[in-house]
Structure formats: C-alpha cells, structure tokens
Amino acid sequence: MTDPHTTTLPTQFDPTGIEPKWAARWRSEPFRADATSGKDPFTIVIPPPNVTGNLHLGHALDNTLIDTLIRYKRMAGFEALYLPGMDHAGISTQVVVERQLKDAGTSRHDLGREAFLEKVWEWKGKSGGMILDQLTRLGVSADWTRERFTMDEGLSRAVRTQFVKLYHDGLAYRGERIVNWDPASQTTLSELEIDREVRKGKMYTLSYKLENSAERGSNGETGEIRIATVRPETIFADQAIAVHPEDERFRHLVGQKARIPLTDRWVPIIADEAVEMEFGVGALKITPAHDPTDFEVGERHGLERPSVIDLDGNLTRDELVPAEFQGLERFAARKAVVKALEESGDLLEQKDHDTAIGLSERTKVPVEPIISEQWFVKMKPFADQVLEGLDKGEIKLVPERYTKVNRDWLENIRDWNISRQLWWGHQIPAWYDKEGNIYVPDPENPELDCDQDPRYAHLNLRRDPDVFDTWFSSNLWPFSTLGWPDTDSEDFRKFYPTQVLVTGYDILFFWVARMQMAGYGLTGQAPFSTVMLHGLYLDAKGQKMSKSKGNGIDPLELFGQYGVDACRFAFTFLSTGGQDIKHDARRFEQGRNFANKLWNATRFALMRLGEARIEGSDDLSAYVRAAVTLPDGVLLRSKDVLAQLKERDDLTLADRWIISRLNDVTAEASAQLDAFDIGAAIRTLYSFTWDEFCDWYIEAAKPELASGNLGTMATLKVVLEHVLKLLHPFMPFITSELYAALGHRRQIAVHSWPQPDAALHDAEATKAFDALRSAVDSARSLKSELGLSPQDRLNVAVDGDLADVVRQNARVVEGIARVNLVPALEGRTLSQVAPGVTILAPLEGTVDIADWVKKQQKRLAELDKQIKQAQGKLNNEGFVARAPAEVIEEEKRRVADFGAQKERLEGVLAQLG
C-alpha cells in the first residue's frame, strides 16, 4: 500500500498491487458503526446470499450499489451501518451435503437427523461462507463485527418468537392446500426455488359424455362436451366441468352431469368466472387436488379433492385410478392414458402446444401441484398494514413504477405455506399428542419446548419434523439482525428501522413484500423507508445467465481482467432506473481506462507540485494550507477551503472555472445519490473528471504550473482531492491509494463528503472559459478540415463578442489547440462559428485551394451516400421491426451527424464561391 508520505507513484497503474492490501485492511479493520453516537443512522442490510453460493454478477451488482450508498452516507456524516451475513439456504444446503453423503456411499437417513445436522454444520464451517470472502475482494465497507447467519442463536430465537406469536394470534395454522411439490427432494418449494420453462407439449381435446345424450355441446355435437387439457393423466381426479357463467355456448348445460372418460364416474357441470372462455374449447375440467386454480374453484363449490398422484410422482393405487394405470410414473401414465383414450374414441384431437412448466431449481425435476397438509400463515392482515403504509408514504419504491406492482401483489395475497419437508433449517416448534392435537410454546416463554413443559409431561408429545421455509427467517432479516425480539438492544434502538433496501426486482414478492409485512406485523413499523430495485444482469444478448445455457460470466474473472474499481464503475454506470442490464464489455474497458486516467492525473499533480508540497497535514497538506492562507490548527470543510481558495488574487480564469464547475458537479452528484440514481451520479462524475478536469483544466493549468503560480498549484491539489472524494464511493481502491499518495494519513473513506455552496458558482468564469473551449474546439476542427495533423501549428484569428476573453487567455488556447493566435489574417479564410466566438484560419499558404475544394466536393458526395444508406435502413419497416433499439438509435445518430457535416461543407463551399 502506498506510504502516506510518498511523493511518487509507479508509472503504470496495477490494480493487483493495491486491491488486496486495501481489501484486507477493510476486513481486519472494519467500518464499525457506533450505536451510541449522536449521528443520524443510515442502515442497509445485505440481501443475505446463500451459504452455498459463490459470487455471481447479481451479488456483485447488489453489493456495489449498497457499498456506494454506504460510503457516500458515511462521508456525508451519517452513522452508516452496512450489515453483512448469509442465509442458511435450506434446500440448497441440504442437497449439497446429501450429494456428498451419496458419493461416500451413505445417506441422511442412514445417519439420522442429529448426525446429519452435525455434518451440515461441519460443512458450513469448512466450505460455507466463501461468498463473504469474495465480497471482501469487491471492497465492501461492511461492519464485519456484526456479521449474521440466519441459523445463529439470536436469529433462531427471532424465528421461533415469530411463529409462536403468529400461532397464538390465530394467524399460523395447519391445513390442506395446494403446494409445489418436488418428488425428487420430497419437499414443498417456494416460487423462487422453481425455474419456469416453456417446453413443447401437447394439447388434448377429450370427449366427456353428457348424461342427457340429446343435449348438444359447444360445437353443436350431440351428447358430449369437449374439454381441452395438457394433463390427461389427472382426469381420474376430476370433480366437475366448469364453464363461464356468461358463455352462451354452455349456459344450458349448467347443472347437468358428464362422464369422465375411461371411468364410470359422473361429475357436475358448474359455472365459475375462473374459466377463460377463449382458452381451449371454453370448458375446463376441475381437478382440485392437482391445480391451484381448480383448488380455488373447488373451495367455492364445495367439491371433494381426491389426489391421484402420490409424493413420488406416480399415479396412486387408488380405486379412482383404473388398475392398468396404478403405480405408473406420471409421464409414463400420460402416454398410457392417451393411448387408452385413442382406443376408446374419447380423444378427439391432439396438437402441439407450448406448455410452461415449473422445474425444481435444485433437482431439475418437474414440480407437481399436490394437496398436502402443511403449515400456513394468513397474510391478508399483514398485507393490509403494508398497503396502509404505502398510502401514507411510509415506504417508497425506486423506481416508483414498482409501487403498483407491489400493491397489486399485496391486494391479491394468498396464505403462505411456511413448512418444508427438510432437516436443515429452523425446526417448527409445534408438537402433537397421539390424537393429533397441536401444542405450541407459550408466548411468555417461547424458548421452552412443549415436550419439556411440565404441564404436558404426561402426554408423550412428538415434535413436528418439518422446518420453516427459508424465507420465514429471511423475512425478519432487517430487525432480527439488530437484536429483535429484544427491542431495547442498542442496535435495534439505533439502527432500526433501516433506511434503504437494495435488491433486484425479481424478489420483490418473495422477500421484499414479506419483509414489509413482517416489519409492520412484528415491530409496528416499516422495516425500511426506501426500496431501491435494480434490474437483472443479463448477458450481452439480453438473455438470463444460467449454467445450462453456458452464458454465465464469473465476476472474479472480470476483477482479474479489469480491476475491481473498473468493474464497480461498470456496474454503477450500467445501472439505470431499474431496467435490466445487458453485459457490455466496453463499459468495463471504459472503467479501466478511467482508473488509468485518474492515476496519471495524480502522478502529474505530484510531479508538478514538486518541492512546494510539504507533508504532515492530516486533512490538507501544509502546502495547500499555506497556499490558501488557512490558520494553523483549523480543519475546514471542503467548501470552506474552496471559498477561501476562490478569494486568492493569483487565480487564473481556468482556476476560477474549475472551482465553479467542481461545486456545481458536487451539488448535482449529491442530489443524484440522494435520489438513489447511482448510475446518473457516476456518469456525471465521469464526464466532469475526464472531460473537464483532466482534458481541459489540467491542460489549461500546465503553463501556470510551469511558471510556479501558487494559486494554480493550490487549485490543482484541492480540486484533485475533491474529485477523489466524490469518486471514492464508486471506486474505493484507487481513490484510497491516491489520497494516501497526496499526503493523508487518515484514509479517504472517513473524510467528509464535499459540500456544495451556491456562492461558489461563478457564472462569469463559466461563460468566459466556455468561450476558450469553443475557440479550441473550433481551431481543432479547422485544422482537421484543412488536412493538418493535431501536432501541426496554424495561425488563427478570433472574432466575436467574447474575442477579448480569448485574446486575454491566448496561452491556454495556443497551448491546447497548438495554434498561434494572430491579430488578423490576409486573404481568403475558413471560419468556424461558436456562441460568442468565431475562429478564422487562412486558406492561402495553408492548402492548395482548388485541390482542397475538389476533396471537399468528393467528401460531400460520400456524405450524401452515407445519409441515403442510413436513412434507407430507417425507412425499411422490416429493419425497424427486427433491429434492437440501440441499433436504430445509432442509425438515427449517423443520419444527424452526416447531415450536420454536409450542412457545414455546403456552407464552406458556398463561402468560397
């Protein structure tokens, strides 16, 4: 790591030379938040990654955005807490350990529950948590002393307290409902543990014979009603035929009965608005045990709900199922049933049909909707509390459009299945006696197991073997990590409720909404005031990354290729308004180039300040302290330094301009960060640093620095330090290194964020320096049009309202544009007009005018051709319909650019006659 007293930097920037040292320092000397401080809190809890996980681009994006906000708020004077931790990831972890046991020739059932759980904890100790080490490499400024795990003792107590309260409040209950069942892992699954995939399948149209054979069906056929289904193997569990009450085709059949094919069972024809009249043939078979919608229809109509598919995914050995199909695997049964339907004449049609199916994320086995007795939580009371909070503005979603999405889900909330048939997780604290009565610990003593309670000693209770859904613990994350249910703990009182949650929109329902409901339900408050949602990180073609597609990108490889700061730059630069993010290697290259630019600018400053720079100050170097005439011993805020710097009488126009622009950009970037528009903030700072500070100010300052102008030296150092502070939340490694190289013992992360001051805005200097920039741009453009290289010198003259400003600062224009500013020019000239400034260049003596005109006419013809080609694409409806939006925008830009060049050339040629 650079010694704070060094005066030089290596010629080349090498991220690998600085990143490991700073990362190690931030892990060993964490940014500990003080629960007793008088500062306003700013808390963000990490979306806890799975203990089984490795860092992927979603994690890298999440935590870069979080760390950017945390570092900004810490510098802005808040007591900032970035709370890290991991989720126990019930099914994922159990699958990993079971796979290891299988490789060793055993199983969890061979070991038994206690021994298996010991194996899981052993695995967690050795292999779990690798992702947190990878987050350290990302440079997150987390408070590692507060690291949490959802199976920690304190968090386990919170989970237990939650369930006990819900049960005794009548909100947690045991009942039969449709659940997502994984036949391979033998457990229910949450929606987030299911991958949705569209596969080629078949739609089967079946004939259900009507009880009154004289009646006509929907298509005028006599004695039958036609049903379309993608799952003919479930017909044996049918309990009704449903039609829409307003469907004229079927209204006359409501109340009659129809026979299930291949059976002698008759079911009623009912009317229900759940039926989509346009789907299939407009009539729906109702199988309450094997479809969520059918289950709800069955509830409304009091239908029975027998199941014909067992927990292994086979047809049951039940009298409802004809003997020849009993015990068949469900997909084999489908083929057998279709064949039998063909033979019986009840299969009227089968056609190709794209079917959306759910696959278990871990086992890749198709999920089976089945009825199962599970634990559920009534969610509507909690959803109503969140909706009221949204109405009051207690929770803000960024971007705002997600508020409606959030609200729609809450308004249509369903009860939550919280039990899982696993061993790894929080075992449900419920016990049963031999009659099946349920016993749950007393709310006054939730830690006391019922089988240890003296009141129940005579009952020989057995504990529920199931565990809670992983989300049942992670929904407590914003407050269980801060000590809840101990609401008097220092951390809970200081840091709860948290300020911001940063996460992807894809878990808005599974996690974010549930945290909102848990927060209101258990603490009486919203768990966070702002939810900042970002999009999914996609590959360069806009597709989701997955192992099966082979399109995944390892962020650790990106770190090695570009450097972590460059990657953080890219992640933030690409983040725009909650939109999905396409991987763009150019942004990572841009980040690497930007880091190099910053490194070289600091090297230049160190070399130019030279012997005038005196080491030793903790906040500002003694040199700058003297240069801006600050009294010894007084540490001033950034804006005070700039204000006193501005009052010096040896500042140049460029010095005054960059001070004003720095102040304006500080205000702009701060406002963008406060609005959680992190992408806009880094784009603002990038443009200012590269274009204005490095390319314009430093170039303009070179003559003054060479002549020893103390005002310019002070301006260069103070502005550079401000730039490093502004960029620090985004690119912490390089800014920390460079700030230390400028003579600071305290790391930049604990310095104050620059404060804008309206008095520092200098409209006069801005207008004047803009005139210089226009003069330079015009001179460069003229040299290019005349066929000169950037290094060739050219005599130019200036005219216009701001010509005197340009003449007074001739050294700047001449040095940057490599021209000689002369009072006037003889003969024919070529001019470039900008607001307030016209630059003229001589034609005679510079070019062969006739030859030059001929070249411009040829160029004009080329431009006409290019405009027609680009415009032709835009006029092609097929191209516009197929091409990505960015390609279309590029063609529009080409038309505009070529048009502007053409207009310029036509004007020049007309001027020459």
UniProtKB/Swiss-Prot annotation:
Its main location: cytoplasm. GO terms for cellular component: cytosol. CDD domains: Anticodon_Ia_Val, ValRS_core. Its EC number is 6.1.1.9. The keyword Transmembrane does not apply. GO terms for biological process: valyl-tRNA aminoacylation. A motif ('HIGH' region) lies at residues 49-59. Keywords: Aminoacyl-tRNA synthetase, ATP-binding, Coiled coil, Cytoplasm, Ligase, Nucleotide-binding, Protein biosynthesis. It catalyses: tRNA(Val) + L-valine + ATP = L-valyl-tRNA(Val) + AMP + diphosphate. It is found in: Cytoplasm. It holds the Pfam family Anticodon_1. A motif ('KMSKS' region) lies at residues 544-548. GO terms for molecular function: aminoacyl-tRNA deacylase activity; ATP binding; valine-tRNA ligase activity. Transmembrane segments: none annotated. Belongs to the class-I aminoacyl-tRNA synthetase family. ValS type 1 subfamily. Monomer. ValRS has two distinct active sites: one for aminoacylation and one for editing. The misactivated threonine is translocated from the active site to the editing site. The C-terminal coiled-coil domain is crucial for aminoacylation activity. Catalyzes the attachment of valine to tRNA(Val). As ValRS can inadvertently accommodate and process structurally similar amino acids such as threonine, to avoid such errors, it has a 'posttransfer' editing activity that hydrolyzes mischarged Thr-tRNA(Val) in a tRNA-dependent manner. This is Valine--tRNA ligase.
